[in-house]
Amino acid sequence: MSSTAGGEVSINSGDLLLGTLSTSITKLEQQIRATQLSQKKLNSDCETMAEYLRDLSEYKQPVDLLPYVGKLNDSTIRVNNTHQKLDDLLERLTKLQRQIARETYKKKNSIKEQEPPVQPEN
Protein backbone atom coordinates (compact mmCIF):
# COMPACT_ATOMS: atom_id res chain seq x y z
CA MET A 1 0.00 0.00 0.00
CA SER A 2 1.37 3.43 -0.85
CA SER A 3 0.18 6.99 -0.54
CA THR A 4 0.71 9.86 -2.92
CA ALA A 5 1.42 13.50 -2.15
CA GLY A 6 -2.17 14.55 -2.86
CA GLY A 7 -3.44 12.57 0.12
CA GLU A 8 -4.84 9.80 -2.09
CA VAL A 9 -4.32 6.23 -1.11
CA SER A 10 -3.66 3.72 -3.84
CA ILE A 11 -3.95 0.01 -3.25
CA ASN A 12 -1.71 -2.34 -5.10
CA SER A 13 -3.80 -5.33 -6.18
CA GLY A 14 -0.92 -7.68 -5.41
CA ASP A 15 -0.76 -6.44 -1.81
CA LEU A 16 -4.53 -6.84 -1.46
CA LEU A 17 -4.40 -10.37 -2.82
CA LEU A 18 -1.53 -11.34 -0.51
CA GLY A 19 -3.34 -9.80 2.46
CA THR A 20 -6.47 -11.81 1.71
CA LEU A 21 -4.50 -15.01 1.18
CA SER A 22 -2.48 -14.50 4.34
CA THR A 23 -5.68 -14.09 6.39
CA SER A 24 -7.14 -17.25 4.85
CA ILE A 25 -3.93 -19.18 5.42
CA THR A 26 -3.80 -18.05 9.06
CA LYS A 27 -7.39 -19.22 9.63
CA LEU A 28 -6.64 -22.53 7.93
CA GLU A 29 -3.55 -23.06 10.11
CA GLN A 30 -5.64 -22.39 13.24
CA GLN A 31 -8.23 -24.93 12.13
CA ILE A 32 -5.52 -27.50 11.41
CA ARG A 33 -3.99 -26.98 14.86
CA ALA A 34 -7.41 -27.30 16.50
CA THR A 35 -8.04 -30.52 14.56
CA GLN A 36 -4.66 -31.91 15.60
CA LEU A 37 -5.43 -31.15 19.26
CA SER A 38 -8.82 -32.82 19.03
CA GLN A 39 -7.22 -35.85 17.35
CA LYS A 40 -4.71 -36.12 20.22
CA LYS A 41 -7.55 -35.94 22.76
CA LEU A 42 -9.53 -38.55 20.84
CA ASN A 43 -6.47 -40.82 20.78
CA SER A 44 -6.02 -40.36 24.53
CA ASP A 45 -9.71 -41.14 25.13
CA CYS A 46 -9.43 -44.27 22.96
CA GLU A 47 -6.44 -45.46 24.97
CA THR A 48 -8.32 -44.82 28.22
CA MET A 49 -11.32 -46.78 26.93
CA ALA A 50 -9.10 -49.67 25.82
CA GLU A 51 -7.50 -49.77 29.26
CA TYR A 52 -10.93 -49.75 30.89
CA LEU A 53 -12.07 -52.62 28.68
CA ARG A 54 -8.92 -54.60 29.52
CA ASP A 55 -9.60 -54.07 33.22
CA LEU A 56 -13.21 -55.07 32.73
CA SER A 57 -12.24 -58.29 30.98
CA GLU A 58 -9.96 -59.25 33.89
CA TYR A 59 -12.83 -59.30 36.40
CA LYS A 60 -13.79 -62.75 37.59
CA GLN A 61 -17.41 -61.76 38.12
CA PRO A 62 -19.46 -61.34 34.97
CA VAL A 63 -20.95 -57.97 34.19
CA ASP A 64 -24.61 -57.65 35.19
CA LEU A 65 -26.46 -57.44 31.91
CA LEU A 66 -29.97 -57.89 33.32
CA PRO A 67 -30.91 -54.18 33.13
CA TYR A 68 -29.79 -54.07 29.51
CA VAL A 69 -31.74 -57.23 28.69
CA GLY A 70 -34.84 -55.65 30.24
CA LYS A 71 -34.41 -52.51 28.15
CA LEU A 72 -33.90 -54.62 25.06
CA ASN A 73 -37.10 -56.57 25.80
CA ASP A 74 -39.03 -53.32 26.30
CA SER A 75 -37.73 -52.03 22.99
CA THR A 76 -38.68 -55.29 21.29
CA ILE A 77 -42.22 -55.03 22.66
CA ARG A 78 -42.50 -51.43 21.42
CA VAL A 79 -41.24 -52.40 17.99
CA ASN A 80 -43.71 -55.30 17.81
CA ASN A 81 -46.59 -53.03 18.87
CA THR A 82 -45.64 -50.52 16.21
CA HIS A 83 -45.40 -53.29 13.64
CA GLN A 84 -48.86 -54.54 14.59
CA LYS A 85 -50.32 -51.03 14.30
CA LEU A 86 -48.74 -50.64 10.88
CA ASP A 87 -50.17 -54.01 9.80
CA ASP A 88 -53.63 -52.94 10.95
CA LEU A 89 -53.29 -49.66 9.11
CA LEU A 90 -52.17 -51.45 5.96
CA GLU A 91 -55.14 -53.80 6.19
CA ARG A 92 -57.57 -50.87 6.51
CA LEU A 93 -55.94 -49.12 3.57
CA THR A 94 -56.21 -52.28 1.48
CA LYS A 95 -59.92 -52.58 2.32
CA LEU A 96 -60.44 -48.94 1.41
CA GLN A 97 -58.66 -49.43 -1.91
CA ARG A 98 -60.85 -52.45 -2.67
CA GLN A 99 -64.00 -50.49 -1.90
CA ILE A 100 -62.85 -47.63 -4.10
CA ALA A 101 -62.05 -50.06 -6.92
CA ARG A 102 -65.51 -51.67 -6.58
CA GLU A 103 -67.27 -48.31 -6.66
CA THR A 104 -65.21 -47.22 -9.65
CA TYR A 105 -66.05 -50.46 -11.46
CA LYS A 106 -69.77 -50.02 -10.71
CA LYS A 107 -69.74 -46.42 -11.95
CA LYS A 108 -67.93 -47.38 -15.15
CA ASN A 109 -70.39 -50.20 -15.80
CA SER A 110 -73.39 -47.97 -15.17
CA ILE A 111 -71.98 -45.40 -17.60
CA LYS A 112 -71.35 -48.09 -20.24
CA GLU A 113 -74.87 -49.51 -19.83
CA GLN A 114 -76.53 -46.18 -20.41
CA GLU A 115 -77.68 -45.64 -23.94
CA PRO A 116 -75.81 -42.93 -25.74
CA PRO A 117 -77.92 -39.91 -26.58
CA VAL A 118 -79.33 -39.88 -30.08
CA GLN A 119 -77.50 -37.43 -32.26
CA PRO A 120 -79.58 -35.40 -34.69
CA GLU A 121 -79.17 -36.32 -38.31
CA ASN A 122 -78.08 -33.70 -40.81
From Swiss-Prot:
Keyword annotations: Coiled coil
This protein's record includes keyword Coiled coil: yes
Entry annotated with the keyword Coiled coil: yes
InterPro entries the UniProt entry points to: Snapin, Snapin/Pallidin/Snn1
A GO CC term attached to the entry: BLOC complex
One GO biological process term: positive regulation of gut granule assembly
GO MF assignments: SNARE binding
Coiled-coil positions: 76-109
Subunit structure: Component of the biogenesis of lysosome-related organelles complex-1 (BLOC-1) composed at least of blos-1, blos-2, blos-4, dsbn-1, glo-2, mutd-1 and snpn-1. Interacts with dsbn-1.
PANTHER family from the UniProt entry: SNARE-ASSOCIATED PROTEIN SNAPIN
Protein's job: Component of the biogenesis of lysosome-related organelles complex-1 (BLOC-1) involved in gut granule biogenesis.
Similarity annotation: Belongs to the SNAPIN family.
Protein name: SNAPIN protein homolog
UniProt lineage: Eukaryota, Metazoa, Ecdysozoa, Nematoda, Chromadorea
Designated gene of the protein: snpn-1
